Amino acid sequence: MITDVWKYRGKSTGELRSSVCYAIKTGVFDYAKQFPSSRNLEKFGEARQDLTIKELAEKFLALKETEVAKTSLNTYRAVIKNILSIIGEKNLASSINKEKLLEVRKELLTGYQIPKSNYIVTQPGRSAVTVNNYMTNLNAVFQFGVDNGYLADNPFKGISPLKESRTIPDPLSREEFIRLIDACRNQQAKNLWCVSVYTGVRPGELCALGWEDIDLKNGTMMIRRNLAKDRFTVPKTQAGTNRVIHLIKPAIDALRSQMTLTRLSKEHIIDVHFREYGRTEKQKCTFVFQPEVSARVKNYGDHFTVDSIRQMWDAAIKRAGLRHRKSYQSRHTYACWSLTAGANPAFIANQMGHADAQMVFQVYGKWMSENNNAQVALLNTQLSEFAPTMPHNEAMKN
């Protein structure tokens, strides 16, 4: 039986057979074009041209679910959702060409975006880094379509990434940090930002920090988990998982102060999700920082969220009269202050959860070179105490 026979009911079976045989003989036969509704298309690995970009993206995301962590999957979904709103989710994937992709990239780079709840958008568009990330995710969708026979070609061929300028850290100065702490409305907020700045932990790690992870007697703090969106996960990087942070005195003092507020509070049993799909572990956690201690309203949770910490930072920055920065600059402040104090970059990388010092050099390289005078002054102070001086007589002979 010939598939799609109704399409060809004006032709005899013999005529159809002759035209198909001739197309095969001359090398121009296209099974998918000749029989677009055939059940054999998938068997023969023929490209389907009828998937919308939304349908293709949904197939891609469905298979990604077991490959990546849920936080990464949510990022994929959010990015693709934003892109589809520009492309038009009902457009056929096969209709998207290079010109359309360049239009999408331009819109991402220069157009207005809808901000998340309580987020501050200071200017239209997105950074080149963000746009390149969006386009990389979209490229993965199209490549998935090619690899699995849904598309004949990837329209991303020949499109190069936008040139990126590396983000320069914008740490707080010591005077600004004092003003920030003074602007905090309660002791818990003061303690939280002291711990953040003097340890360099990520905001999500700060939210998930438990007293079970802290050993003030030995001056250490273990980072075992992270809060990502609505669930606990292991820290962002493998190197950052179960890392031991060696606490300096200001951090210890802040934790001792916080101990009086939350150390004897309720212990929770929480589910921590690992990188491996479907694997979780129950952990005991008495949260170090708790909204209940300083909440003005009753609809608080057992722990802070990354958004609530960011709002706390924004409010304190505004009250202190400081130039607006993102709360992640507290982490950069730790790194920059530590480098100025002469700490080994490898030690800083370990404290911050990086695999090696390469990330420290990449992120803070320019900042480090701008502080050469401070480094020379540091060396003069430290080395002058024990470095031998050249004898004057020997110097005269030479």
Curated annotation (Swiss-Prot):
Belongs to the 'phage' integrase family. One of its GO terms (biological process) is viral genome integration into host DNA. Integrase is necessary for integration of the phage into the host genome by site-specific recombination. In conjunction with excisionase, integrase is also necessary for excision of the prophage from the host genome. Residues 51-146 form the Core-binding (CB) domain. The keyword Amino-acid biosynthesis does not apply. One of its GO terms (molecular function) is DNA binding. This is Putative defective protein IntQ. The gene is intQ. Residues 167-378 form the Tyr recombinase domain. It comes from Escherichia coli (strain K12). The keyword DNA-binding applies.
